[in-house]
Each structure stands twice: as C-alpha cells, then as structure tokens.
Amino acid sequence: MKKMMTFLKKAKVKAFTLVEMLVVLLIISVLFLLFVPNLTKQKEAVNDKGKAAVVKVVESQAELYSLEKNEDASLRKLQADGRITEEQAKAYKEYNDKNGGANRKVND
C-alpha cells in the first residue's frame, strides 16, 4: 500500500485543470457571440443584392415585352408569357415593398 501511495505521489500526470478548461470555453463562447450576428447581417445583405438583381431582370424583361408587343407589361403578363417565374415576381414585389416602391416600373 505504501508503495502504491509513493508511486502515485511521484507520478505527475500533465493535464489541464478545470479552471483552464472553463476559461477556454468562456473565450470560445464570447467569440461565437461576436461572430453570429455578423453572419446574419451578411445573409441579409446577400438576399437584398439578389433581389436587386431580380428587379433588374424583371424590368429588362418588361421593357423587351413592351417593345415586342407594343403594350405595357405587368407581372402577370410576363409570367403568362414565360419571361419570368413566380419566384422572380414574388422577389420583385418584396423588394419594392421593402424599399417603398417609388421607382417601381412594372405593375401587378
């Protein structure tokens, strides 16, 4: 028994303490809290840019439709003619609703 106790006293195991592990977890959680809001802002910015691109596509398709058919284009007419999809029409409406719709060129 004495040999076992002396052996355990002599054998020093290198390991992290509980306090060190808690500090590491604290640092990781603080970094996580700093980066997550930035990721959501980036996602919103990408979505807005994508919808702005869809607006340009819809407006250019409306202009082409007006030139070919000699009548004003609407979202319904563009969809019926197969020039835009339902998702593009929805994105066009959402973008204009969000930005006030003052510069809207294509009506429903």
From Swiss-Prot:
Localization of this protein: Cell membrane; Cell surface; Fimbrium; Secreted
Any single Pfam family the record assigns to this protein: N_methyl
Sorted UniProt keywords: Cell membrane, Competence, Fimbrium, Membrane, Methylation, Secreted, Signal, Transmembrane, Transmembrane helix
Cleavable signal peptide: 1-13
Recorded superkingdom: Bacteria
GO biological process assignments: establishment of competence for transformation; protein secretion by the type II secretion system
InterPro entries linked to this entry: Bac_GSPG_pilin, ComGC, N_methyl_site, Pilin-like
TM ranges: 16-36
Modifications made to the protein after synthesis: Undergoes proteolytic cleavage.
Ranges in a coiled coil: none
Result of altering E20D: Undergoes proteolytic cleavage, but abolishes secretion
Matches recorded under NCBIfam families: IV_pilin_GFxxxE, pilin_ComGC
Family: Belongs to the ComGC family.
Subunit structure: The transformation pili are flexible filaments, consisting mainly of the major pilin ComGC and smaller amounts of the minor pilins, including at least ComGD, ComGF and ComGG, and perhaps ComGE. Homodimer. Forms higher-order multimers. Interacts with ComGG; the interaction is probably direct.
Record function comment: Major component of the type IV-like pilus (T4P) that plays a role in transformation. Transformation pili are dynamically extended and retracted, perhaps thereby promoting DNA uptake and transformation. Required for transformation. Required for DNA binding.
Protein name stated in the entry: Competence protein ComGC
Native species: Streptococcus pneumoniae serotype 4 (strain ATCC BAA-334 / TIGR4)
